[in-house]
Amino acid sequence: MDIYQRLSGLVGNILLLSKLENQNIPMKKTEYRLDEQIRQAFLSLETKWTEKEIGSQVELEEVKYTGNEGLFMHIWMNLLDNAIKFSPAKGTIMMFLKQEKDSVMFILEDEGPGIEDDVKTRIFDKFYQADGSHKAEGNGLGLALVKRIVDSAGGTIKAENREYGGCRFVVELPIQKDEAI
């Protein structure tokens, strides 16, 4: 990625984050297939995961969701991009989507280095990058943006380490139509 694309992405993320924090985003709610959106996000990153020969395990239940489709694409693109970025070559990324009675749960796991305990509390802060992440492209805005979008939908996001290495992100979103963005 060249410097102009990175700068454009940075400016776009700063503006979007600012709008979210000031609640200046028009709430364009539509019903769409969340599983298809996640699948599209993953396929749009195909160049990155094929370059590293990363495999995938994908179990996405069919889920119709009402929310701001454009904003939600930022969630999946950022989480998937990070999973690819921090996964070792020939690693595996696992993603699961399931619908509960009152919520939808998305789980994304990778085989990367995981997250140090002192970092877990700060990874959703603006401009925060863990020491080891400076080797990879990024600006410390992606997860902050993801958190603001999830929060504005009345959902939750958490990051945890997997028992045998790697990281797990869990996003839970309410399915009540009046609470989704």
Regions found by a protein language model. Give the residues of each.
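Short conserved segments within the C-terminal catalytic ATPase subdomain
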Residues: 48-57
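Short beta-strand/loop element within the Bergerat-fold HATPase_c
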Residues: 90-102
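Short alpha-helical segment of the dimerization/phosphotransfer core of two-component systems
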Residues: 2-7
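Conserved glycine-rich
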Residues: 154-155
